[in-house]
Curated annotation (Swiss-Prot):
CDD domains: RHH_NikR_HicB-like (cd22231)
Name of this protein: Uncharacterized protein AF_0569
One matching Pfam family: RHH_1
Lineage, opening ranks: Archaea, Methanobacteriati, Methanobacteriota, Archaeoglobi, Archaeoglobales
GO BP annotations, alphabetical order: regulation of DNA-templated transcription
Taxonomic source organism: Archaeoglobus fulgidus (strain ATCC 49558 / DSM 4304 / JCM 9628 / NBRC 100126 / VC-16)
InterPro entries, per database record: Arc_rbn_hlx_hlx, CopG, Ribbon_hlx_hlx
Length: 60
């Protein structure tokens, strides 16, 4: 398993309740797992922008 980093976030009660519903329905085993999946989807959405930024950093 690759190294991990622990973070802390604040969510509205509404968002947290929706995440709990996903866990209770069996879609995820924990709220943390649901948040990790959300981050993964976000990073995939911005993959091209992130690659461009990484390339710009190479030229600095």
């Amino acid at each position: 398993m690759p190294p991990t980093r622990k973070i802390s976030i604040r969510l509205t009660e509404k968002y947290y309740t929706k995440l709990e519903l996903l866990v209770e329905s069996g879609e995820f085993t924990s709220v943390s797992e649901a948040v990790r999946e959300a981050v993964k989807l976000l990073l995939e959405k911005y993959k091209e922008q992130l690659e461009s930024i990484a390339q710009m950093d190479t030229y600095r």
